[in-house]
Regions:
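A broad, low-amplitude sensor of folded, mature protein cores
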Residues: 1-10, 58-59, 112-117
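Short terminal alpha-helical segments
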Residues: 1-51
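Alpha-helical interaction segments
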Residues: 12, 36, 74, 82-83, ...
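Surface-exposed polar/charged interaction patches
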Residues: 14-17, 25-26, 49, 53-56, ...
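Residue-level recognition of alpha-helical structural elements
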Residues: 35, 54-61, 81-88
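Generic structural signal for well-ordered, non-transmembrane alpha-helical segments
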Residues: 37-40, 44, 66-73, 90, ...
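Mature extracytoplasmic domains of secretory-pathway proteins
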Residues: 43-75
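Amphipathic alpha-helical binding modules
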Residues: 79-119
């Protein structure tokens, strides 16, 4: 079952907080806290859009996946691909994948992001 509150908390604990912590520990200057916040905002927009689907069907769910992946691609590209690295990639993928399934995705590919993802 899709629990928006739980997923919103996961954005913070599994994606944005770890990136910010790494950024500070490693003294990263390739991106800013605002860039990390934008990444979180894109994920929140995705989760909110899923929660607002009245009768979720695969096409509508996958349209939201495509939209967020393309937006994340654009954000990451603008930062010379520095924001979304291996650890972040896995956390973001897992969040997008499980949210799509919990929202009601029936024909579940191994990776819902694969078709569009550049990170």
């Amino acid at each position: 079952m899709f629990d928006l509150k739980e997923y919103l908390e996961r954005v913070k604990t599994e994606v944005t907080d770890p990136i910010l912590e790494y950024m500070q520990e490693a003294e990263i200057e390739d991106f800013t806290a605002d860039d990390v916040a934008r990444c979180g905002e894109l994920l929140v927009e995705y989760l909110t859009a899923l929660s607002e689907l009245k009768e979720p069907v695969d096409a509508d769910i996958m349209a939201q996946v495509e939209k967020v992946v393309l937006a994340l691609n654009e954000l990451n590209e603008g930062l010379d691909y520095a924001l979304i690295e291996t650890v972040e990639r896995e956390a973001i993928w897992e969040l997008l994948q499980t949210a799509a399934v919990d929202c009601g995705l029936q024909n579940v590919p191994e990776d819902v992001t694969e078709e569009w993802r550049e990170w």
